[in-house]
Amino acid sequence: IMYLIVGLGNPEEEYSKTRHNMGFNAINKIAEQYGIKVTKNKFQGLYESALIEDEKVILLKPQTYMNLSGNSVKEFVDFYKISKEEILVIYDDMDIEPGKIKIRKKGSAGGHNGMKSIVSMLGTEEFTRIRIGIGRPEHNGDDINYVIGSIPEEEIPKLEEGVEKAKEAVIEILKNGVDSAMNKLN
């Protein structure tokens, strides 16, 4: 069994500190804790394979634009013959407040372009996802600026908390399975 753990984000440097990059941040946190460098480049993604909690994993940050993330994920899934039960996708979600996460075994992509791309490329919604709350902008209709604009200093700790919880969720899933993670962390 090999797990594919995907964090979604935008590869360009200018987006590195934005709400839309929570998935990348979570992968970086996991990598940091286990001394893994996610720097190999293949299938339009930065990745590394490693052992985490005695499980074989690939940590992946697709380097396509967000709305093409599925292209990279699909190539990894096909090449490593990863079953949908072993796919985890981590991404930002405006319907969840900052500092909170939600773990689900399946479901629609919601309004998230990266997830839409993955669902469409894999042809299934049945894979685990960890959504990191980023909340909503005060003024409706400002969504784009909100997700890729810079984050006010005072909001960073809350968002970091969500990233930290997402990391814990991944570790819990690898150790004890998705149900256990859902019970403990949702």
Kindly label every feature range from the protein language model:
Residues 111-114:
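Hydrophobic alpha-helical segments within soluble ligand-binding/sensing domains
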